């Protein structure tokens, strides 16, 4: 009789454990934190911010010297590189295939004042599209990591 009650307890525990696993498996998994890319709104949202940012840069007399002589095609390529870099850096599916920042900005003579003005334009573009403060801060923090390779003077 004793071995039968041990068997019953083992059987009951086994069934209970199986039932618990079945129930736990049917519960939704704890939501994983969304990437910055997802929180911003994905590719189209990033593209809108980048497009606005580029319009601001190209329209600013301070940046004329950097864009003078570039063809429309060249400007489109620069835009795509910026978009791909932001997309990849925010956790999106894009792959940045451009040159490293130091190489692509070498010889341009970008100053701290240029950097600060560009950062203000980017912040204004993020504000225009109502990117929340947390996400805006993360984008600007990423861009700040590039400063040492972009600013020459």
Residue ranges of predicted features:
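Core of compact, soluble alpha-helical bundle domains
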Residues: 27-153
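Bacterial N-terminal signal peptides
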Residues: 12-24
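Low-complexity, intrinsically disordered segments with a bias for serine/threonine
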Residues: 8-9, 22, 30
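A general, composition-driven signal for non-globular sequence regions
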Residues: 3, 22-26, 141
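N-terminal secretory signal peptides that target proteins for export/translocation
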Residues: 1-8
């Amino acid at each position: 009789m004793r071995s039968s009650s041990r068997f019953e307890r083992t059987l009951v525990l086994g069934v209970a454990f199986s039932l618990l696993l079945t129930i736990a498996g049917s519960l939704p998994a704890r939501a994983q934190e969304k990437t910055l890319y997802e929180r911003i709104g994905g590719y189209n949202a990033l593209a809108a911010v980048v497009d606005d940012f580029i319009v601001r840069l190209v329209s600013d007399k301070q940046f004329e010297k950097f864009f003078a002589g570039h063809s429309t095609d060249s400007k489109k390529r620069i835009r795509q590189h910026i978009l791909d870099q932001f997309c990849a850096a925010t956790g999106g599916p894009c792959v940045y295939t451009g040159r490293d920042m130091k190489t692509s900005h070498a010889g341009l003579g970008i100053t701290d004042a240029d950097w600060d003005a560009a950062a203000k334009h980017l912040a204004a573009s993020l504000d225009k599209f109502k990117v929340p403060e947390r996400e805006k801060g993360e984008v600007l923090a990423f861009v700040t990591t590039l400063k040492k390779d972009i600013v020459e003077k």
